[in-house]
């Protein structure tokens, strides 16, 4: 098992990989303000890059759901924080509304430039391994931006002939926020959601979201970075999983804490989501 440490990025988070490209594009189109929703890491990264480019930055956060340390980073960079009652999904909806109303530039991973930038995580890992492709690449599953970017990077590297083997992607959901696991593994209506040659069952996703709303199901896990009930990149993730013959599973919060301990005992630090 090999770990890819992302804490050495400027804001201390993997988000910087995609934020650098997204904010670069925002600057190219002469945006004056960037907007996002965040459970912590995105707010710090967006705020840092906005400050570097002398841009305004509004971040919508779920009330009471962000660690103080992550909030302090965002404040340090002059970010405007707007608290929203509810969870990340609610904050994300509000951020999109605000972006449309104020001509802001959204830098969440719904932005394709974020996905392009995050491909560099895999590039660096494979470069370090002398382009010897591992059997598995494992990601925690939240908004599924990393899953999508990794899958796109694998597809392109394989097409270009840089790699001869396709690694399998494993996505790990938290037990209290496992939308992809439920849909991918047929735990809702007995139908397994797949890419299906670019024609995934969108209605199945919508029916599941409607049931979540009707039954009052809200994502809940101590791993707030992946406490997301409606992953915005779920369709892109399906394509990545199909290309790599990937798998999706769920772990408990307790298992994630055990994972954090194992990482820590080997001299590395990680947040709870990465313990999955």
Task: Please state what every model-predicted region is.
Residues 23-25, 49-60, 64-65, 152-160, ...:
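A glycine- and small-aliphatic-rich helix-loop capping segment at beta-alpha/alpha-beta transitions
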Residues 22, 29-49, 54-62, 133-146, ...:
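A short, small-residue-rich loop immediately preceding and capping a beta-strand
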Residues 6-14, 34-43, 110-114, 139-143, ...:
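Active-site nucleophile and cofactor-binding loops and adjacent substrate-binding regions
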Residues 89-103, 156-273:
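Active-site/ligand-binding loops adjacent to catalytic centers
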Residues 97-161, 257-261:
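Active-site/ligand-binding-proximal alpha/beta "capping" segment
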């Amino acid at each position: 098992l090999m770990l890819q440490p992302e804490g050495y990025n400027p804001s201390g988070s993997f988000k910087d990989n995609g934020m650098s490209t997204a904010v670069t594009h925002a600057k190219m189109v002469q945006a004056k303000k960037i907007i996002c929703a965040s459970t912590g890491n995105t707010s710090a990264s967006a705020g840092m890059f906005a400050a570097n480019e002398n841009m305004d930055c509004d971040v919508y956060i779920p009330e009471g759901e962000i660690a103080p340390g992550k909030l302090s980073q965002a404040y340090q960079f002059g970010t405007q924080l707007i608290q929203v009652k509810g969870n990340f999904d609610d904050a994300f909806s509000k951020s999109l509304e605000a972006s449309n109303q104020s001509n802001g530039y959204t830098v969440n991973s719904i932005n394709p430039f974020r996905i392009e930038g995050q491909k560099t995580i895999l590039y660096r890992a494979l470069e370090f391994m002398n382009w010897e492709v591992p059997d598995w690449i494992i990601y925690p599953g939240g908004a599924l931006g990393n899953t999508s970017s990794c899958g796109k990077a694998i597809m392109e590297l394989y097409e270009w002939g840089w790699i001869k083997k396709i690694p399998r992607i494993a996505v790990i959901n938290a037990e209290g926020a496992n939308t992809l696991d439920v849909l991918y593994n047929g735990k809702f209506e007995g139908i397994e959601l797949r890419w299906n040659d670019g024609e995934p069952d969108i209605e199945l996703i919508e029916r599941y979201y409607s049931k979540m709303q009707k039954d009052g199901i809200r994502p809940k896990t101590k791993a707030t970075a992946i406490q997301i009930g409606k992953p915005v990149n779920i369709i892109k993730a399906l394509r990545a999983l199909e290309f790599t013959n990937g798998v999706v599973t769920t772990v408990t919060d307790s298992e994630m804490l055990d994972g954090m301990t194992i990482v820590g005992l080997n001299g590395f630090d990680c947040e709870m989501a990465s313990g999955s």
